[in-house]
């Protein structure tokens, strides 16, 4: 039942499309993967009809200002959850070009960690991980799609920033991938994995337009007193193509995006190196949804938490029945829909998170399916569980 669509949201965006200039990135949000490390600012949601809509304040350079967005689809209950349940399909915004995060495979299927979190939400809400319609969105399009209600949730390696969370008028869910911006160059140009940013002085640097990546590298170059020529492109396929052709000396985006591109696009006659060893920015990536819908926020957030709680407890898709029977403790019994469950208080079925783990997997399983194949190691990273020295620390299911 999984479906993929591209730019259908533009019919809903209408006049907003002209103002959806560029929105920040997954360098934190480029299309590297579209690259994480795969972000922009937009206007607050439109006021009720009787209230005149105000022009939003001008956004920072990396965030385009937009007109107030149309209200999201509502039902009698007035929320996104009810709308999705009535529709029977989750509309999920993704990149469609971000290696390991969301990319369209040769068979037309959407793959990656972001795509799998779309499936996880569909499993929680509808009981079917395949009840998803994917919408591929550029960095400039993504936040307008959230504001207009063209997508129910955005899983597009988008960086959580103050301006996006406040001025643009959206809400961010739990971080699903802690990333950081890095650079990539050719070893033949005397770069190594230990190179510093100062070494790109005089270089032609390429990245996505309208992303946090673009802003970060511009600000850092000014702080370091180095001169770069910054060329930007609409999507990261164009960035990588220009790099392969020799038009760019250096490309930059989220580190995870660079790792993904290197894994699948490095020519045999070239050696690409990623640097500096310590990323130049923080790029927390995760779900984005319309603001002021607490019920929907709870659903999306606890879907993410469920994958992490299962990971904490060592419960995989193969163990859910044993966990529901109590073999992994009382918390997992509650989480999977047994005695003391809390899912029905959220407007979901008691077995909502049973469906998530059984159909999609826990966080480690999602990681192994999408990130391990391109060489991203969770061990020792910020994405490890808190018990292993990482930042993944879900609240308890009780």
Give short role names for the model-derived ranges:
Residues 20-25:
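C-terminal motif of bacterial Sec signal peptides marking the signal peptidase cleavage site
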Residues 91-100, 110-125, 159, 179-241, ...:
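Bilobed "Venus flytrap"/periplasmic-binding protein-like clamshell domains
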Residues 71-75, 123-125, 187-191, 204, ...:
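Extended ligand-binding regions for polar small-molecule ligands
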Residues 119, 123, 127, 131-199, ...:
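Acidic, polar ligand-binding/catalytic clefts
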Residues 77, 132-144, 192, 230-245:
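Short helix-initiation/N-cap motifs at beta->coil->alpha
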Residues 27-37:
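Bacterial lipoprotein signal-peptidase II cleavage site
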Residues 3-13:
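Bacterial N-terminal signal peptides that target proteins for export
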Residues 74-154, 348, 385, 389:
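Extracytoplasmic small-molecule ligand-binding "clamshell" domains
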């Amino acid at each position: 039942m999984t479906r993929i669509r591209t730019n259908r949201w533009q019919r809903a965006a209408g006049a907003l499309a002209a103002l959806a200039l560029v929105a920040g990135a997954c360098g934190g949000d480029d299309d590297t993967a579209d690259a994480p490390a795969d972000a922009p600012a937009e206007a607050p949601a439109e006021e009720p009809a009787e209230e005149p809509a105000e022009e939003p304040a001008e956004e920072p350079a990396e965030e385009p200002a937009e007109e107030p967005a149309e209200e999201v689809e509502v039902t009698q209950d007035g929320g996104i959850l009810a709308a999705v349940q009535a529709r029977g399909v989750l509309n999920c915004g993704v990149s469609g070009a971000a290696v390991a995060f969301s990319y369209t495979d040769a068979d037309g299927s959407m793959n990656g960690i972001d795509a799998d979190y779309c499936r996880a939400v569909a499993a929680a809400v509808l009981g079917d991980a395949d009840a998803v319609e994917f919408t591929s969105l550029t960095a400039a399009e993504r936040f307008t799609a959230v504001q207009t209600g063209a997508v129910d949730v955005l899983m597009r390696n988008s960086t959580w920033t103050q301006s996006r969370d406040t001025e643009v008028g959206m809400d961010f869910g739990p971080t699903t991938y802690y990333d950081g911006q890095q650079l990539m160059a050719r070893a033949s140009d005397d770069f190594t994995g230990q190179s510093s940013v100062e070494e790109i002085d005089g270089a032609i640097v390429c990245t996505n337009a309208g992303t946090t990546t673009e802003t970060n590298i511009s600000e850092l170059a000014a702080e370091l007193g180095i001169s770069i020529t910054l060329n930007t492109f609409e999507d990261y396929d164009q960035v990588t193509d220009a790099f392969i052709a020799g038009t760019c000396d250096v490309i930059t985006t989220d580190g995870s995006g660079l790792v993904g591109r290197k894994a699948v696009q490095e020519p045999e006659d070239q050696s690409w190196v990623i640097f500096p060893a310590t990323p130049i920015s923080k790029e927390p990536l995760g779900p984005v949804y319309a603001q002021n819908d607490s019920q929907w926020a709870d659903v999306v957030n606890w879907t993410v938490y469920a994958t992490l709680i299962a990971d904490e407890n060592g419960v995989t898709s193969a163990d859910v029945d044993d966990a529901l029977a109590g073999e992994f403790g009382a918390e997992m019994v509650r989480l999977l829909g047994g005695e003391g469950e809390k899912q029905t208080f959220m407007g979901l079925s008691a077995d909502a998170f049973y469906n998530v783990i059984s159909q999609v997997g826990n966080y480690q399983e999602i990681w192994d399916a999408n990130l391990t194949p391109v060489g991203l190691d969770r061990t020792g990273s910020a994405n490890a569980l808190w018990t292993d020295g990482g930042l993944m620390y879900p609240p308890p299911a009780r």
